[in-house]
Amino acid sequence: MNKLRSVLPGILLFAVFTVFTALMCYVDVQPVGMASTGLGFATLNTDVNRALGSNETIYKITEILGYLTWCVVALFGLLGLYQLIRRKSLLKVDRDIIVLGIGYAVMLAFYVLFDKFPLNYRPPYPWNEGELEASYPSSHTLMLVFVMATAVMQISHRITKKTLRLLLSIACIAIAAVVTAGRLLAGVHWFTDIIGGILLAAALAALYYGIAWGKKDRTENTAAE
């Protein structure tokens, strides 16, 4: 029961993402995408896209910030490798690091899945040469939100200095927020692409927290009481 309670928020968020994704396939689907491809919630998406327009500068900024995702992934990968070499056993590597590696793999699996079987394609924007690119969910949003959310969790558990912990956490949250908003403002994703990316990332992050620390945190809270 305790294990289920730990992962329940993540399961519920994933259920919301699944329902939202299903609705994308049936609600207000119109051939308004690039090359007249279908798009769910078409009226909402096209209204938002027309209102915001496109901005190549913002797009380039989000692309640059997107590389930070892989820097963070590499950092925790190196931490896991260091522990493995130092402790000479995979079983002795911190549980939260092992689960984080699995989380990264699951995140990439979802990226590949939606790239190979796209639900819709990106909206037309001036610097696109007509190439059809999978758009749902926004991969930048998915990766930045998940990686930065789990980074904040790692920071809160590994860094003892409050000021440094706060500054690093704010930086992670700010980067994720800027990229998420930037992908929409740049005009390279539909509104529902962003929502889908946030929902999936939040579900994976909640599942990660529940598996890596949920039971431990509840035990500590009970002991404190």
Residue ranges of predicted features:
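Hydrophobic, lipid-facing residues on alpha-helical transmembrane segments of integral membrane proteins
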Residues: 8-19, 98-113, 117, 146, ...
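Membrane-interface loops
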Residues: 32-34, 84-166
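Long, hydrophobic/aromatic-enriched structural stretches that serve as scaffold segments
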Residues: 76-86
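Hydrophobic, aromatic-rich alpha-helical transmembrane segments
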Residues: 3-7, 60, 64, 89, ...
